[in-house]
Design a protein with these regions (language model features):
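Boundary-proximal intrinsically disordered activation/regulatory segments immediately upstream
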Residues: 1-62
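RNA substrate-binding interface of SAM-dependent RNA methyltransferases
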Residues: 50, 106-200
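Short, aromatic/basic amphipathic alpha-helical patches
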Residues: 67-76
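A glycine-rich helix N-cap at a beta->alpha junction
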Residues: 78-81
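Glycine/small-residue-rich loop that forms an oxyanion/phosphate-binding "nest" at active or ligand-binding sites
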Residues: 88
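Glycine-rich phosphate-binding loops that contact phosphosugars or nucleotide phosphates
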Residues: 101
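Single conserved hydrophobic/aromatic residue that forms the stacking wall/gate
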Residues: 201-212
Length: 212
């Protein structure tokens, strides 16, 4: 069972996982260093747990405890209980859904794991986290088999990407390409037809590429 700890001081060192969640550069270094990502909202927390990700801790406003009681009863990690005002002070934004979890980051797929797929979405240098999350959500909804990300593309496990994806980052396979050009060549060698999206009226339809 989780250990509930009421906290009233935003400088408490135990809250380090949740500090300044809107500071992208800070979060990028902190999350990589400590091997974590942040799940925001009860639904996202549940989906992360259902996908097998393990929590490090929780940061909750009191009114969200009962809704997550079954999850909290099943884990042995600290639950930091704070007021909603203090949560905003800690994280740097208003936590609308009042529930955050620090989860253990895992690398679940490599590019080689996706090479038997039929259809893959490839993200070239898409650096906006919400765009990456939206692409993964759309790919999952449209029945694509996975997503490959160029080396410079945004982190799918960054908080805003996870939130925008509605948790589909936990279920749809995705992997990062170590080398952009080499990765495209490998896709072609494995029999994939690589089609780039270009928003010009003169661009051919993907349908025109079928069978080519």
């Amino acid at each position: 069972m989780a250990c509930f700890i009421e906290i009233n001081d935003s400088s408490d060192e135990r809250l380090a996982d949740y500090v300044q969640l809107r500071d992208v550069n800070l979060r990028r270094s902190l999350e990589a260093q400590h091997g974590l990502f942040i799940a925001e909202g009860a639904k996202i927390i549940r989906r992360a747990g259902e996908a097998g990700y393990q929590p490090r801790s929780f940061l909750l406003a009191p009114r969200w405890i009962d809704g997550l009681r079954d999850i909290l009863d099943a884990v042995d990690v600290p639950v930091y209980v704070v007021s909603e005002a203090l949560a905003e002070q800690i994280t740097g934004f208003h936590v609308h859904r009042g529930a955050l979890a620090s989860m253990r980051r895992e690398t679940r797929w490599q590019m080689a794991d996706l090479m038997d797929a039929d259809r893959l979405v490839v993200c070239e240098d898409i650096v906006d986290h919400t765009n990456v999350g939206a692409i993964i959500r759309c790919a999952a909804g449209l029945g694509w088999d996975g997503v490959l990300l160029a080396p410079r593309a945004a982190d799918p496990l960054y908080r805003r990407a996870v939130k925008t994806s509605m948790g589909t980052v936990f279920s749809l396979p995705w992997a990062r390409m170590e080398d952009w050009r080499g990765g495209l060549d490998e896709l072609k060698e494995r029999g994939f037809t690589v089609v780039a999206i270009c928003l010009l009226y003169t661009s051919p339809s993907p349908r025109d590429q079928r069978g080519s």
